[in-house]
Amino acid sequence: EAARMASWLASRGVGSGDRVAIYARNHPESFILLFAASRIGAMMVPLNWRLSEEELAWQLADAAPSMLLYGADFAGIAGKLASHAGCPGFEIGTKLDAARESHGMEAEEGPGGPDAELMVVYTSGTTGRPKGAVLAQAAMRANAEMSHHAYAMTPDDHVLNILPLF
């Protein structure tokens, strides 16, 4: 799925250094986008679905995404946000699945790499406007490796994440 998403994003003009925002509750698409972005050198920008339209519009203006993916339950506001941000918006679901169905990318293709920036996560903004904290692939990999060792995880383990993915 990540390979098809990476190829589909590239076919829509998303490339190295571009940002793709995702506005959805916890959804497998968030992980698919994260791994797809890592392949093409793009950055994922997860949005806090608890924020007001005004706060989201500010974050999108700050992040300057090339594209907005959104969950069906946010379709009403997402169209306005995408228009305000000047980027296309695509609803997560069967239409997006069908659009990328014909795409594929070999694992070794794409400009993504360990030194590439991978995600922009916004702080809570307790002292002012939220700030976009940029996370590199290497930092996220190091975090995953530390978790793997700290919890003695094996390929047979499953992880339940109850936290929001923004």
Question: For the regions a protein language model found, what residue spans apply to each?
Answer:
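Conserved pre-ATP/AMP-binding loop-to-beta segment of ANL
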Residues: 105-122, 129, 152-158
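Conserved short alpha-helical elements in the N-terminal third of ANL/AMP-binding
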Residues: 36-40, 158
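Structural core segment of the AMP-binding/adenylate-forming
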Residues: 4-12, 39-101, 108-111
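Conserved AMP-binding A3 loop
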Residues: 118-142
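Short, well-ordered beta-strand segments
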Residues: 19-23, 118, 158-161
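Conserved AMP-binding/adenylate-forming core of the ANL superfamily
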Residues: 1-27, 31-35, 52-57, 137-138
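Conserved structural elements of the adenylate-forming
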Residues: 1-4, 133-154, 159-166
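Conserved G/P- and acidic residue-centered "switch" motifs that form tight phosphate/ATP-binding loops
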Residues: 20, 41, 126
